[in-house]
Amino acid sequence: VVLDAVGHNWDNGKVTKEATKTAEGIKTYTCTVCGKTKTQSIPKKKAGEEKQLKKGDVVTDDKRAARVKVADVKKKEVEYKEPVNKKAKTVTIPATMKINGTTYKVTKISDNAFKGNKIVTRITVGKNIKSIGKNVFSGTTKLKTITLKTTKLTQKTVSRNAFKGISKSTTIKVPKKKLSAYKKLFKSKGLSSKVKVKGY
């Protein structure tokens, strides 16, 4: 703990943005007396200094948009856990994202990723998603549109109740060539018959 001349009593600081090979990081200090914060830059990492990710690690992508879980290090695949900004009305699960400057494919949406989110109104699901966990959209009362770009979903890769609990006012948009197959698939995974599924 550091006490400076103007009376601030700074804590030991928290890394709020990790440094990478391409960008500096940020460390934020908070005054334990008044709550004021100050930031300090963390130098870019040199070659070889990057933390080696392993399967199961939960990290934030370089854009600070999402928390993801490393699914396969060799194939460079991650699982989307949740958005960083819990107040975001529009969320995009991209086809790929960068972690420590390295590109990873986003291939799965974790269980409960948006469960109980009463703010989000639009969710776009990227083309590389091949697996969806349980209760991903349950309780998303303000959700108006889910746009799926993926054509890789199957009975085996979509969890039971993956689409349960979606508001009746939600519309799901899917690639036109998958409309018939996805309608059957989603209903078998808990989707209400009152939710519209449209092709685009």
Task: List where the protein language model places each region.
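Short, surface-exposed terminal/edge motifs of secreted or surface/virion proteins that either
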Residues: Q40, Y182-L185
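A structural signal for leucine-rich repeat
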Residues: R160-G165, K184-K189
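N-terminal low-complexity, Pro/Thr/Ser-rich intrinsically disordered segments
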Residues: A47-R67
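Extracellular modular ligand-binding repeats in secreted and cell-surface proteins
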Residues: V1-E49, M97-K98, K105-I109, F114
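Structural signature of tandem-repeat unit edges
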Residues: T16, K86-K108, K118-S131, T141-K156, ...
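LRR flanking "cap" motifs
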Residues: T60-K115
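Extended beta-solenoid/beta-helix repeat architectures
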Residues: D72, Y80, G126-K127, S131-I132, ...
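Consensus positions within tandem repeat domains that build extended binding/scaffold surfaces
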Residues: S110-A113, G133-V136, S159-A162
